[in-house]
């Protein structure tokens, strides 16, 4: 899968079409002992080994190729996005190629879920292409924030349709797409991952219905699922102990939380209290809009308005720091 193939494949992609069911074999690197065994094996086994090696070579070649694509500055991003909207093919190609590494980063999060990394990247690239087509630079948000939603949803859609043991009925998939599309639109408008409450308010649907539908987009794996090349370990064996967190990630979380507390001091008291209660800061437990409203004697809608105002103010603070809302809340919302 070359960069040029990625750019031209948009004609084959329609996010609204139902995905075809595809059989896929995930190639894995074999050890020296396995290589010896292959040399004495049947022709079919040797061909399978050669295919695995070629798949790995193709992945490494692709990752090396996209490493030469320079990232765009915020100003360049707006410039090329405007040109792309006017039909400039060169600008469209530059937007895509400059964000291919974002696709790889997101695709790695979905490894070991039934699709090979290269297949995940290919699906994510389709989402990136559609994001370039739909992105509106005049809204003032970075392209990566908007593109992340398209990339994630195309990957998750592929996993949902190609790896589910029980496939969802077509009408359920279409209903789910409505919720996912609304979530993408809200993410561009609000510059953060929308909560079920915000999606429900936008669609005028009960929060419980939104939560249930979004759960259909999650993939559930048994803790006894074998992992690794030899399958000698189960998923349960590598699940992290929440009481013994990785020191590196704990340090990162602490740094983000400390910065967040400092930024909260720049908000007015009401905004600070609402955000603290909503996101579990300053000793509070995370609460819903309704719960926060009951605690501070405000309506759910008023709490939502204060939250939006507070997040908007935080975004302004982050822009001055050269950061974005995703960097602030990835500890709370990262999948």
From Swiss-Prot:
Q: Where is this region: Sigma-70 factor domain-2?
A: 95-165
Query: Major place of localization?
Result: cytoplasm
- Record InterPro entries: RNA_pol_sigma-70_dom (IPR014284), RNA_pol_sigma70 (IPR000943), RNA_pol_sigma70_r1_2 (IPR009042), RNA_pol_sigma70_r2 (IPR007627), RNA_pol_sigma70_r3 (IPR007624), RNA_pol_sigma70_r4 (IPR007630), RNA_pol_sigma_r2 (IPR013325), RNA_pol_sigma_r3/r4-like (IPR013324)
Q: Does the keyword field hold DNA-binding?
A: yes
Q: Output the GO biological process annotations, alphabetical, semicolon-separated.
A: DNA-templated transcription initiation
- CDD domains from the UniProt entry: Sigma70_r4
Location in the cell: Cytoplasm
Which residues does UniProt assign to DNA binding? 289-308
**Region Sigma-70 factor domain-4, residue ranges:** 263-316
Keyword Lipoprotein listed? The answer is no
Annotated GO CC locations:
cytoplasm
Query: What are the alphabetically sorted keywords of the record?
Result: Cytoplasm, DNA-binding, Sigma factor, Transcription, Transcription regulation
Annotated region described as Sigma-70 factor domain-1, given as residue ranges: 57-90
What GO terms are given for molecular function? Answer: DNA binding; sigma factor activity
**Function recorded in the entry:** Sigma factors are initiation factors that promote the attachment of RNA polymerase to specific initiation sites and are then released. This sigma factor is the master transcriptional regulator of the stationary phase and the general stress response. May be required for the persistence of V.cholerae in aquatic habitats.
Per the similarity annotation, which family is this?
Belongs to the sigma-70 factor family. RpoS subfamily.
Share what the entry says about its subunit structure, partners included: Interacts with the RNA polymerase core enzyme.
According to UniProt, the name of this protein is RNA polymerase sigma factor RpoS
């Amino acid at each position: 899968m070359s960069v040029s193939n990625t750019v031209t494949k948009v004609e084959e992609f329609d996010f609204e079409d139902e995905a075809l069911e595809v059989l896929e074999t995930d190639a894995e690197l074999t050890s020296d002992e396995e290589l010896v065994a292959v040399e004495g094996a049947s022709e079919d086994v040797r061909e399978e080994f050669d295919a695995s090696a070629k798949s790995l070579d193709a992945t490494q070649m692709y990752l090396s190729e996209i490493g030469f694509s320079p990232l765009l500055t915020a100003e360049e991003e707006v410039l090329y996005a405007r040109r792309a909207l006017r039909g400039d093919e060169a600008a469209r190609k530059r937007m895509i190629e400059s964000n291919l590494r974002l696709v790889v980063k997101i695709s790695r999060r979905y490894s070991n879920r039934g699709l090979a990394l290269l297949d995940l990247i290919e699906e994510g690239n389709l989402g990136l292409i559609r994001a370039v087509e739909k992105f509106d630079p005049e809204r003032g948000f970075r392209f990566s924030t908007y593109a992340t939603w398209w990339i994630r949803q195309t990957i998750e859609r592929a996993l949902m349709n190609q790896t589910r043991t029980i496939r969802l009925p077509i009408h359920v998939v279409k209903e789910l797409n409505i919720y996912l599309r609304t979530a993408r639109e809200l993410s561009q408008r609000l510059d953060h991952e929308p909560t079920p409450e915000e999606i429900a308010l936008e669609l005028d649907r009960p929060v419980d219905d939104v939560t249930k539908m979004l759960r259909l987009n999650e993939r559930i794996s048994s803790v006894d699922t074998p992992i690794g090349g030899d399958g000698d370990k189960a998923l349960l064996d590598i699940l992290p102990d929440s009481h013994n967190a990785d020191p590196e990630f704990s340090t990162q979380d602490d740094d983000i939380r400390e910065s967040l507390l400092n930024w909260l001091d720049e908000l007015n008291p009401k905004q600070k209290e609402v955000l603290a209660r909503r996101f579990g800061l300053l000793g509070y437990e995370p609460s819903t809009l309704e719960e926060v409203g009951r605690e501070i004697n405000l309506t759910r809608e008023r709490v939502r308005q204060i939250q939006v105002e507070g997040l908007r103010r935080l975004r302004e603070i982050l822009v001055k720091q050269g950061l974005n809302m995703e960097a602030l809340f990835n500890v709370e919302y990262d999948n």
